[in-house]
């Protein structure tokens, strides 16, 4: 069989797969008679409301000299680590705004960072295709730098995100531009499992984000530039357990819902979506129309402790607070006093749900605290 014939057969098979996928999508839409917001309205659910003092900027963390790309909170809620284009990781005391560590990175092109569950170590990765681990208790060297305690090498593309397995300082999952996710044993520095990639059923484009279920740490979800999100079981690396369709652009961010049965996605297409991992159904779309025709991309997202609120960062500097039940925007932090002056690149909620931190291309991080008549939701 000639190369031309093989290409023709491949194109025909691809078209068949796409046709079947579209039929499956239409069938699911027929069976799904309502979405979450429709059901909530039918049950008489009232919308969440915010007053002018219910979520306010209480801290501005200044110290980076380049765009902030990533942030993460410690489980004990009072420290934040941030990664910036300036080639540094900074660990902040969220209560005082003071810097406790400033780590100069071996590679300045960092894209992601994460705190270990114990808060004793931080991880980061970027265009060097390596995930570097720093022990915050290690002494600095003669040049005043923190030494790398472990380098996790094995990816063939940039490291786009990393997250420690809950309650474990010894295992971590990374996603990469090489279309794979990897579970690492930090103690040995070796790959425990590789998810996707050549000869495996996985993503067909760069993987941008991962989120591990807190209720079942064996499960994690990944989002990719192939417009899909996939559910994985760490015990079965050869294939994804589920594949979720619906987006029309790169999936930039994924986040598990607090109960572990659902997860959210955010995309270049300007939408966030809520999926159920048990039924594979899309439960809700969160989209705010823009009159000027320019659709801002979703960059980051986080759920409140109860899941009733969804915080979403956008490329135009908006940061919407969504009512997840009614699919309504209840507040835009991009339009209030002390809002960021650039793209919202990352955000995260403290462990107790009492504060939100946002990071931006304006080089700053801001901490937003619940106050007024609004308690933690």
Swiss-Prot record:
The keyword Repeat applies. PROSITE patterns: WD_REPEATS_1 (PS00678), WD_REPEATS_2 (PS50082), WD_REPEATS_REGION (PS50294). Coiled coil: none annotated. One of its GO terms (cellular component) is heterotrimeric G-protein complex. It comes from the Eukaryota. GO terms for molecular function: signaling receptor complex adaptor activity. Transmembrane segments: none annotated. Pfam families: WD40_Gbeta (PF25391). Gene3D superfamilies: YVTN repeat-like/Quinoprotein amine dehydrogenase. WD repeats lie at residues 63-93, 105-135, 154-185, 202-233, 246-276, 293-323, 339-369. Keywords: Repeat, Transducer, WD repeat. GO terms for biological process: G protein-coupled receptor signaling pathway. G proteins are composed of 3 units, alpha, beta and gamma. Guanine nucleotide-binding proteins (G proteins) are involved as a modulator or transducer in various transmembrane signaling systems. The beta and gamma chains are required for the GTPase activity, for replacement of GDP by GTP, and for G protein-effector interaction. Belongs to the WD repeat G protein beta family. This is Guanine nucleotide-binding protein subunit beta-1. It comes from Nicotiana tabacum (Common tobacco). The lineage of its organism: Eukaryota, Viridiplantae, Streptophyta, Embryophyta, Tracheophyta.
């Amino acid at each position: 069989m000639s190369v031309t014939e093989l290409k023709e057969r491949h194109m025909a098979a691809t078209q068949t797969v796409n046709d079947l996928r579209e039929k499956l999508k239409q069938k699911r839409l027929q069976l799904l008679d309502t979405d979450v917001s429709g059901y909530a309205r039918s049950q008489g659910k009232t919308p969440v409301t915010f007053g002018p003092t219910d979520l306010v900027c209480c801290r501005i963390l200044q110290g980076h000299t380049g765009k902030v790309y990533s942030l993460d909170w410690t489980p004990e809620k009072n420290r934040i680590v941030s990664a910036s284009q300036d080639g540094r990781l900074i660990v902040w005391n969220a209560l005082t705004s003071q810097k406790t560590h400033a780590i100069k990175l071996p590679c300045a092109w960092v894209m992601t960072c994460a705190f270990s569950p114990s808060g004793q170590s931080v991880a980061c990765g970027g265009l060097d295709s390596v995930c570097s681990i720093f022990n915050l208790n290690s002494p600095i060297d003669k040049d005043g730098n923190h030494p790398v305690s472990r380098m996790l090498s094995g990816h063939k593309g940039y490291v786009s995100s990393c997250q420690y397995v809950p309650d474990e300082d010894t295992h971590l999952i990374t996603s990469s531009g090489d279309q794979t996710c990897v579970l690492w044993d930090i103690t040995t520095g070796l790959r425990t499992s590789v998810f996707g990639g050549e000869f495996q059923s996985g993503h067909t484009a760069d993987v941008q984000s991962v989120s591990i279920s807190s209720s079942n740490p064996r499960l994690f979800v990944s989002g990719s530039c192939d417009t899909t999100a996939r559910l994985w079981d760490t015990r079965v690396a050869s294939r994804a357990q589920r594949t979720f369709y619906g987006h029309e652009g790169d999936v930039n961010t994924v986040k598990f819902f607090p109960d572990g049965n659902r997860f959210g996605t955010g995309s270049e297409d300007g939408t966030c979506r809520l999926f159920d991992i048990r039924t594979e159904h899309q439960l809700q779309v969160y989209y705010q129309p823009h009159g000027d025709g320019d659709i801002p991309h979703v960059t980051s997202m986080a759920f409140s402790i109860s899941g009733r609120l969804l915080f979403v960062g956008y490329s135009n500097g908006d940061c919407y607070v969504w009512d997840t039940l009614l699919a309504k925007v209840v507040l835009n932090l991009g339009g209030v006093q002390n809002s960021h002056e650039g793209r919202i690149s990352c955000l995260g909620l403290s462990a107790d749900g009492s504060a939100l931190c946002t990071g931006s291309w304006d080089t700053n991080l801001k901490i937003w605290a619940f106050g007024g008549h609004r308690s933690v939701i």
